[in-house]
Structures are given as structure tokens and as C-alpha cells.
Regions:
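Catalytic cores of large soluble enzymes that bind and process phosphate-bearing ligands
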Residues: 10, 14, 36, 40, ...
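Short, compositionally biased low-complexity segments
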Residues: 16-24, 148-158, 210-214
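Alpha-helical scaffold elements adjacent to nucleotide-binding pockets in ATP/GTP-utilizing enzyme cores
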Residues: 29-33, 44-47, 107, 141-145, ...
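Conserved Switch II/interswitch segment of TRAFAC-class P-loop GTPases
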Residues: 91-94, 98-103, 113-174
Length: 239
């Protein structure tokens, strides 16, 4: 009989951990990635939409893909590190959705210690970025831990750019990135080489698979094409 050798998947495998302050949108972001890469079907999404509505958390339906236990869904908080897999034509990924709440830092450390890449999610919404970045917020703590645990590459996603308080405004994006750069440098990241910045909306999926439309955000195209933000790609997955 013929021997059929299972071909080894030659695509590079990367572990990516999603970190950041509570409510920055990490679970929604992970859910959106899985949806856009075809890991979740429309029926499942519709089921989650219905369930989220019943729990008065309408905008949380994508997060339910990652937050599978009842406690997480009821509170709208991630407690354990959620894991999922997806692949692009070039790479295979395992994504880990780490809890952002202060009392769950040990769980977050467990996730980050296995990661090749960390994705730091910050919220652009008025006051939310500040809550995560100022005293007591988890944005700084998570970024420092990621560096300490040996994460070599960081993608900073500025989420909720579609929020009415932001409306894809460049001023807010610039304000946030200019605060983060010196801080990340102080953590030991070589900002020009090891950190990329990207404005996104996890809820609408803008800038995930394809760059956001110029009509929505006219300044992003020229910015990434000029390479000013260490990125030559307009959207996250091509990175």
C-alpha cells in the first residue's frame, strides 16, 4: 500500500497575546479577527448577538467568541486566558486573550510568558485611555510585564476610533501614541524597531484585514504609506 505522508505545515507559527486595560476591547478584537478569518460562522455570531442583547450588552457579541464562560459573559470581563487559532496564507497564529482586570494579573502573566508577539489594546474613547494609562491602570503594567517576560515585538492598537468622542480623529490618535512612545521606550522596547502603532475599530473591523476607507479616515493612508509609524501595511493582519 502507498504511504501517505502528512505534509508538515511549513507556515511559521506565532503566539500572540492580547493585553491592556479592562474594557479596552481585547475580547471583541480577538472575536473580530476570528470572524474575519473565517473561524466563526454567521449563525454563531447571530446567536451571540441575541445572547448579548438579552444580557444588555449589545456591543459585546464579538467578545462572546472568546469569553466562553457564564461568569465572563454576565460581568463582561475576561477572567481566564482565552485561546483560539487562525491562519493567514503565510503564518499560523495562536491568540491568547488575557484578562485586563487588576485582580487577574497572574492569569495575564501565564499568557504573556508564552507569547512571541504582544498586542497592546488601548481605547481611544474619551477618558478611557487615560483610565488605563494613569495611576492604577493596567496599560503600563501589562506593557512592562510583556517586556520583562521576553515579548520581543509589540503591536499597539488604538481601538474604538469609531467612537463618537473620537470619530477617527487624528489629533486623538497622535495624542495617545505620543504618550505611549516615551513610556514604551522606558520599558526597554526599541520603539522604532519593535513597536508598531495602528488605529482600529474592533467593533466594525476597520483596519483589521484591509485599511480603513479614506472617506472615514483620510489621514491614515498617507501616514502608513510614508512609514512614519514603523508600519508599511495599512491593516493589522498583513503586519
Amino acid at each position: 500500500g502507498k504511504k501517505v505522508l502528512k505534509e508538515r505545515d511549513a507556515r511559521e507559527h506565532l503566539n500572540c497575546v492580547f493585553i491592556g486595560h479592562v474594557d479596552a476591547g481585547k475580547s471583541t478584537f480577538c472575536g473580530q479577527i476570528l470572524y474575519q478569518t473565517g473561524q466563526v460562522d454567521v449563525r454563531t455570531i447571530e446567536k451571540y448577538e441575541k445572547e448579548a442583547k438579552e444580557k444588555n450588552r449589545e456591543s459585546w457579541f464579538l467578545a462572546f467568541i472568546m469569553d466562553t464562560n457564564e461568569e465572563e459573559r454576565a460581568k463582561g470581563k475576561t477572567v481566564e486566558v482565552g485561546r483560539a487559532h487562525f491562519a493567514t496564507s503565510e503564518k499560523r497564529y495562536t491568540i491568547m486573550d488575557a484578562p485586563g482586570h487588576k485582580s487577574y494579573v497572574p492569569n495575564m502573566i501565564a499568557g504573556a510568558s508564552q507569547a512571541d508577539i504582544a498586542c497592546l489594546v488601548v481605547s481611544a474613547r474619551k477618558n478611557e485611555f487615560e483610565a488605563g494609562f494613569e495611576k492604577g491602570g493596567q496599560t503600563k503594567e501589562h506593557a512592562m510585564l510583556a517586556k520583562t517576560l521576553g515579548v520581543k515585538f509589540l503591536v499597539v492598537v488604538v481601538n474604538k476610533m469609531d467612537d463618537p468622542t473620537v470619530n477617527w480623529g487624528q489629533a486623538r490618535y497622535d495624542e495617545i501614541t505620543s504618550k505611549l512612545k516615551p513610556f514604551l521606550k522606558s520599558c526597554g522596547f526599541l520603539v522604532k524597531k519593535e513597536v508598531k502603532f495602528l488605529p482600529i475599530s474592533a467593533l466594525t473591523g476597520a483596519n483589521l484585514v484591509a485599511a480603513v476607507a479614506d472617506s472615514t479616515c483620510p489621514w491614515w493612508g498617507p501616514m502608513y504609506k510614508a512609514g512614519t509609524h514603523n508600519t508599511d501595511q495599512g491593516a493589522l493582519l498583513p503586519l
